[in-house]
Regions:
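N-terminal catalytic scaffold of extracellular/periplasmic and nuclease hydrolases
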Residues: 45-154, 161
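Active-site-proximal segments of metal-dependent phosphoesterases and phosphodiesterases across multiple
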Residues: 112-135, 235-267
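A short C-terminal boundary segment appended to hydrolase-like catalytic domains
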Residues: 42-43, 53-55, 250, 305-404
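Conserved beta-sheet core of the metallophosphoesterase superfamily
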Residues: 139-142, 253-312, 318-322
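Binuclear metal-dependent hydrolase catalytic cores centered on His/Asp/Glu-rich metal-binding motifs
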Residues: 73-88, 123, 187-240, 246, ...
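N-terminal Sec-pathway targeting helices
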Residues: 2-22
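Short acidic, glycine-rich surface-loop motifs adjacent to enzyme active sites
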Residues: 98-111, 147, 207, 231-250
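Active-site environment of divalent metal-dependent phosphoester hydrolases
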Residues: 69-71, 109-112, 148-162, 179-185, ...
C-alpha cells in the first residue's frame, strides 16, 4: 500500500510539473508574439515590360561632287589646317543634326606619286591623297565611286581607293564601269534613331540600298539598270547617277530618259551629279529626281555656277504599325557595313517584308567661293531653289513623298 501511494504521488508530481512547463511555454510564446511587430504581407515583385520598337527615322544629307586633289591640295598645304582645310567649315551644315552624310567622291585615293596641279589640270587624271581621309570620315558616312574619275589611276587605283575607305570605316558603292553589275548597288548600314514605346529613343542601324551609275561616256545598259530590281522588291533604293553634259542648267533628253529608267527600274529617289552646275528637278511617277547637285567640295572657282551646290536633306521614317518586321530589319542593319556583304541574301532568306518608308525632302545650299565650302546665304539658297524648281517639284510629289 505504501509503495502504491508513493507511485501515485510521483505520477501526480510529474503531471503537475508538465502542466506548469506547458503553461510557462505558452506564456513565453505569448510574450514573444506580443513583443514582435506584425510583418505586413510583401507585395509580389513584378518586372515592368520591356519597351518595344515604335518607329525608326534616319535623317540624311546627300551632296554632289567631293574632291580634295589638284588646287584644293595646294590650298590645304598652304593653310594652317593642312589636311583638315577642305572640311574646316563643314560645321556650318550642322552635322550633328544628321545621322549620315553621303556624297560623290570624284577622285581615286592612292599613295601614288603626285604630279603638279598644272599637270593634273591639263590631263584631268585625278589622284587624291589618303592623308585627307581621317578628316573626311568625321563628316561623311559613305561615298559613291561611280563617276568618270575613279579609274584615273587604273583598276588598281580604284581597288586601293576601296581599301583606304575600308580602313577608315567609310562605306561606298558604285563603280566606274557600269557593266560590272555586282559593284553597282550596295546595302549600306546607316545610323538611325529608334523610337520606343515608352517615349525614349536609342541608336540603331537601318539597311538601305544605294546604287551608283557612271554614264558620262555611255549610257548604262538595260541590264545594268535591271540590277536595281534585285534589291527593290525588299529594300528602299536611292540611285546616284553621274552623267550628262557639263555646265548646263537643264538635262538633255538622253539624261532625263536614263534617269526615268532608274525610277522605272525600282529606284525610290534619283540624285544626280557630274555637270558641275545645279540642274533642275522633276517629280516622276511620284518620285523625286534631282538632275545635278553641283560641286560641293571642288576647286573650280571661275564663276558662280561652279561654286554653288544643292544638298538634299532627306528624312526617311516608318512606324512599327506599318512594318511588321521592323525589329528584324534593325537587326539586319547591324550586319550591312561591309562591302559585298550578304545582306540581300539574309533579307531574302528571312522573307522580310519591304519597309514602306515615308520620305521628306528639303534643300541645303552651299557655296565654295573663296576656296572653301561654306553654307549658302538665304539669298543664295533661294537662287538655288529657283534653279531646282524646288517648290513646283515638291508640290507635284504625291503619296509618301513630301518636302519643303
Amino acid at each position: 500500500m505504501l509503495t502504491l501511494a508513493r507511485h501515485r504521488r510521483r505520477t501526480w508530481f510529474i503531471v503537475v510539473l508538465a502542466s506548469v512547463l506547458v503553461a510557462a511555454c505558452g506564456v513565453v510564446a505569448w510574450w514573444l508574439l506580443w513583443r514582435s511587430p506584425v510583418q505586413p504581407a510583401q507585395p509580389a515583385v513584378t518586372t515592368p515590360p520591356q519597351p518595344t520598337t515604335a518607329s525608326v527615322e534616319t535623317k540624311l544629307l546627300v551632296m554632289g561632287d567631293v574632291y580634295w586633289g589638284r588646287y584644293i591640295n595646294d590650298w590645304s598645304m598652304a593653310s594652317e589646317q593642312k589636311y583638315a582645310y577642305p572640311f574646316h567649315r563643314l560645321s556650318e551644315f550642322e552635322r550633328d543634326n544628321y545621322d549620315a552624310w553621303i556624297a560623290d567622291l570624284e577622285c581615286p585615293v592612292t599613295n601614288n606619286p603626285k604630279v603638279s596641279s598644272a599637270v593634273e589640270d591639263d590631263t584631268l587624271k585625278f589622284d587624291c591623297s589618303p592623308a585627307y581621309l581621317p578628316e573626311a570620315k568625321k563628316w561623311f558616312t559613305a561615298f559613291t565611286l561611280a563617276n568618270n574619275h575613279t579609274d584615273n589611276q587604273g583598276l588598281e587605283g580604284l581597288q586601293e581607293t576601296r581599301q583606304h575607305l575600308d580602313e577608315q570605316g567609310v562605306q561606298y558603292f558604285g563603280d566606274f564601269e557600269p557593266e560590272r553589275f555586282d559593284d553597282i548597288c550596295e546595302v549600306l548600314s546607316l545610323p538611325a534613331r529608334v523610337g520606343l514605346s515608352d517615349g525614349t529613343t536609342k541608336q540603331g542601324k537601318l539597311p538601305l540600298v544605294w546604287c551608283g551609275y557612271h554614264g558620262v561616256f555611255k549610257t548604262p545598259s538595260a541590264e545594268s539598270v535591271a540590277v536595281i530590281k534585285r534589291y527593290s522588291d525588299l529594300f528602299p533604293v536611292v540611285a546616284m547617277p553621274h552623267s550628262g553634259a557639263e555646265y548646263k542648267a537643264e538635262p538633255d533628253e538622253i539624261k532625263s530618259t536614263f534617269y526615268h529608267a532608274l525610277i522605272d527600274g525600282g529606284a525610290d529617289v534619283v540624285l544626280g551629279d557630274h555637270p558641275h552646275w545645279v540642274q533642275s528637278t522633276e517629280a516622276y511617277k511620284g518620285k523625286l529626281i534631282v538632275y545635278s547637285l553641283g560641286n560641293f567640295i571642288f576647286d573650280q572657282q571661275f564663276n558662280a555656277e561652279v561654286t554653288r551646290s544643292a544638298a538634299v536633306d532627306m528624312t526617311l521614317s516608318v512606324a512599327a504599325a506599318d512594318a511588321p518586321d521592323l525589329d528584324e530589319w534593325l537587326a539586319l542593319g547591324e550586319t550591312c557595313a561591309a562591302y559585298h556583304d550578304d545582306c540581300l541574301r539574309q533579307a531574302t532568306d528571312q522573307h522580310l517584308t519591304k519597309l514602306s518608308l515615308k520620305f521628306h525632302f528639303g534643300v541645303v545650299g552651299s557655296n565654295n567661293s573663296g576656296k572653301i565650302v561654306h553654307r549658302a546665304t538665304d539669298t543664295e539658297l533661294e537662287s538655288i531653289k529657283q534653279r531646282l524648281r524646288w517648290q513646283q517639284t515638291i508640290q507635284q510629289l504625291t503619296g509618301s513623298n513630301s518636302g519643303e
